[in-house]
Regions:
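Transmembrane alpha-helical segments that form core, pore/gating elements
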Residues: 60, 118-120, 124, 138, ...
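Juxtamembrane helix-entry segments on the extracytoplasmic side of multipass membrane proteins
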Residues: 14-19, 42-46, 50, 72-78, ...
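Small-residue-rich packing faces within the transmembrane alpha-helices of Major Facilitator Superfamily
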Residues: 30, 54-58, 142, 199-200, ...
Length: 297
C-alpha cells in the first residue's frame, strides 16, 4: 500500500515538473516571431535564419560532446534531415521572409494552426486513424485562418500569408518526424543533432550573408538574433522535450495552444504593434478548434 502511494507521488511530481518545463518551453518559443521581426527589419532573412541555426548548432555540439551522447544511426539520418530542413531552415527562413511583409502579430495567428499541422502529419506519417470529428475541427480551423487572411484585403500581404502557411506546414512535418524519432534517439538529442548536422550549411551561409557593416546594425537586432539562436532554437526545445517526456505528449502538448496569446502580448508590448480584436477572436477560434481536434481525435 505504501509502495503504491510512493509511486503515485513520484508520478504526480513528474507530471508537475513536465507541465512546468513545458510551460517554460512555450514561453520561450513565444518570443520567436517578435524577435524575428526586430531582426529582419535590419538584417537579411537568410542571415537571421542561418545565424540562429549556427548559434544553436554550436551550443548543441558542446552539449552532445559534454554528455557523450551516442551518434545517430544511418536509419535515423533521414528523419533528422527532415527535422533540419523543416524546423531548422525551412520554418525560420520562410517566417523571416513573411515578416518582411506582415506584422509579427499577424503571423502569430498562423501559429494557432501549428498543433493541427503537426497532428495531420502525425496521421500521414504515423498511420493513425482519428475520428471523423477530428477532420471537422481541422478543416474549420484552417477555414478560419484562410478567411482571416482574405478579409484583411489590402491591409495584409498575400505573399506574407502564403509564406507563413508553407512555413507552418514544414514546421508541422518536422515536429511530427521529430516526435517519432525522439522515441529512439531522445527528445533534446533530436533537435541537437538536427542543428549540428545543419552546421556545414548554416555556418558558411551565416558568414556569406553577414552585414558588410555590422556596426551600423542596432543592438535590438543583434539581441533578436541571439534570442532566436539561444532560446528559440535550442534552450526552448530542451525544456519543451523534457516536459513532454515527464508529463506526457498528449497533456503537456496542450500548452502549445498558449503560444499565440503570449506572442500577441509581446508584439503589443515590445514592438508597439496593433493587436486588433479580430486577431484575438481568430486566434481564440483556432485554439478552440485545435482543442476540439485534440480531444476527439
Amino acid at each position: 500500500m505504501k509502495q503504491a502511494t510512493v509511486l503515485e507521488s513520484i508520478e504526480q511530481s513528474s507530471s508537475t515538473s513536465g507541465w512546468i518545463n513545458g510551460f517554460i518551453g512555450v514561453l520561450l518559443f513565444s518570443g520567436s516571431m517578435p524577435a524575428t521581426k526586430v531582426a529582419v527589419l535590419e538584417l537579411d532573412p537568410i542571415f537571421v535564419t542561418t545565424a540562429r541555426a549556427a548559434i544553436a548548432g554550436i551550443l548543441a555540439l558542446i552539449c552532445l560532446l559534454t554528455f557523450k551522447e551516442k551518434r545517430p544511426t544511418k536509419a535515423q539520418l533521414m528523419p533528422l534531415a527532415i527535422v533540419a530542413v523543416g524546423g531548422v531552415i525551412g520554418f525560420p527562413l520562410l517566417s523571416a521572409l513573411a515578416l518582411q511583409h506582415i506584422t509579427s502579430a499577424h503571423s502569430l495567428v498562423y501559429l494557432g494552426i501549428l498543433p493541427m499541422s503537426t497532428a495531420v502529419f502525425a496521421v500521414l506519417r504515423g498511420g493513425e486513424k482519428p475520428k471523423s470529428i477530428f477532420w471537422l475541427f481541422s478543416i474549420l480551423g484552417s477555414l478560419i485562418v484562410i478567411g482571416f487572411a482574405v478579409l484583411q484585403g489590402g491591409t495584409s500581404s498575400p505573399v506574407g500569408n502564403v509564406l507563413m502557411l508553407i512555413a507552418i506546414l514544414l514546421c508541422g512535418l518536422s515536429y511530427a518526424e521529430g516526435a517519432k524519432l525522439s522515441k529512439s534517439l531522445g527528445g533534446w538529442q533530436v533537435i541537437s543533432w538536427a542543428v549540428v548536422l545543419s552546421l556545414p550549411v548554416s555556418l558558411p551561409m551565416m558568414f556569406l550573408t553577414a552585414p558588410s557593416h555590422p556596426e551600423l546594425i542596432s543592438t535590438n537586432a543583434w539581441v533578436g538574433v541571439a534570442y532566436l539562436g539561444v532560446f528559440s532554437m535550442f534552450i526552448g526545445f530542451v525544456f519543451w522535450y523534457k516536459g513532454l517526456a515527464q508529463g506526457g505528449i498528449a497533456s503537456v502538448g496542450q500548452l502549445q495552444l498558449l503560444q499565440p496569446f503570449f506572442g500577441l502580448a509581446l508584439a503589443a508590448s515590445l514592438l508597439n504593434e496593433h493587436v486588433s480584436s479580430n486577431m484575438i477572436l481568430v486566434t481564440l477560434g483556432v485554439i478552440l478548434c485545435v482543442a476540439g481536434s485534440k480531444k476527439f481525435g
